[in-house]
Amino acid sequence: MQMDEQNAAEVLSGSEAGQLVEAALASGADARFEVGGASMAPTIGPGDVVTVRPASAEDIRVGDVVFYRRSDGSGHVLHRVLWKRHTAGKWVLRTKGDALRSLDPLVAGDQVLGRSTTGASRARAWRGLIRVCGYAAVS
């Protein structure tokens, strides 16, 4: 299912909940919260509860689902990492919601607050199912 960027619900954007999650991660604690948007469907949907573990950009791998602060401070996002580069001594990530067509603006390493442990495992399971179905169709 593809969604237009305009129809995608924001994840914790501008809410006090996002600030609480950020504070928990900054203290070194894992944070659990209910996702409000559909930008990561079908892997993570509205109402799903995710666990986010503190992580720096250096710890992040391509394919991880990361929780980060928007560069303008207007809220927080939970999206998948498409690529990661180390340039001029700093990390830069490209992220995108699974259900969105458009890419997110570049994410600076210092915007990254954590990695979803829940969403990451579900995402791997989803990709594994696609591989199995694809193999069965080709065989």
In which residue ranges do the predicted regions lie?
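Extended hydrophobic leader/signal-anchor segments used for secretion and membrane insertion
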Residues: 1-139
